[in-house]
Amino acid sequence: RRLRFFILLFAASSLLFHPPFDFEANATDAWYNDSWEYRKKITASLDTVISSDLTDFPYLVSFTDSDLTKTTESDGTDIVFTASDGTTELAYEIERFDQSTGEVIAWVKIPTVSASDNTDIYLYYKGTATSSSSSVWDSSYKLVWHLNQTSTGTVDEFTDVSDTGNDGTGGGTGDITQDADRRPTQVEAKIGYGQSFDGPTQSGGSEGSGDFIWSQDVSNWPGNNGSTSDNDTTIEFWAK
């Protein structure tokens, strides 16, 4: 069945969790690869944020550093993240990079984020062009929208970066008449770009009159089980 999503809040990303961290340019651990000239050590101190260790957690790295203007590639594709040993590459996704300012927004899948001790990772840059890993968001994520696109009503314009492929379209499509006036608007958000949704998005069980994003392929969502009947689905956003 096609399921219509009416999203009621301004969201900077499908998941926002931005723990405090410190970083340093000089470090003494082993080097990832001689093709990379620089690295920064990022230290997460989460003892006041989480009560137990997190496993395979997509950790948000977001900061601006003029040193990153030295990247080899203007889109940041020479950036690589490693574990605390300095050599084990971690799965990561670069959501946004601005070489002119050194701004980077990335999601790094850390095997264990400690609740009682510092967790260190490294960011390497000015090296060989590579590509982000798609394995940050595994099959347990049914949808991950960063909501950083400009909505034009193009089908599947809001890309689902998980393996599930539940892309979305601003203002409707399919069995919903496309309405340019009901597309969300791209804005500068807490983390990179986000979407502003105008007005109530549901009224009396109908579509209502507000902005929304529509997604068609939800047959593999929890509770659906291939049924032809509608099923309740909860979407949760974390924001800070």
Please report, for each region that a protein language model flagged, where it lies by residue.
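Sec-dependent, cleavable N-terminal signal peptides
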Residues: 1-29
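Alpha-mannosidase-like glycoside hydrolase catalytic domains involved in N-glycan trimming
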Residues: 23-149, 161
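Extracellular and analogous surface-interaction loops
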Residues: 43-50, 219, 237-240
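Solvent-exposed strand-to-loop "edge" motifs in beta-rich extracellular domains
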Residues: 64, 147-150, 232, 238-240
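Short, ordered beta-strand-loop transition motifs
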Residues: 95-103, 182-192
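Short surface loop/edge beta-strand patches of beta-sandwich-type extracellular domains
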Residues: 110, 196-234
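Short, tryptophan-glycine- and acidic/Ser/Thr-enriched carbohydrate-recognition patches
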Residues: 147-182, 197, 212
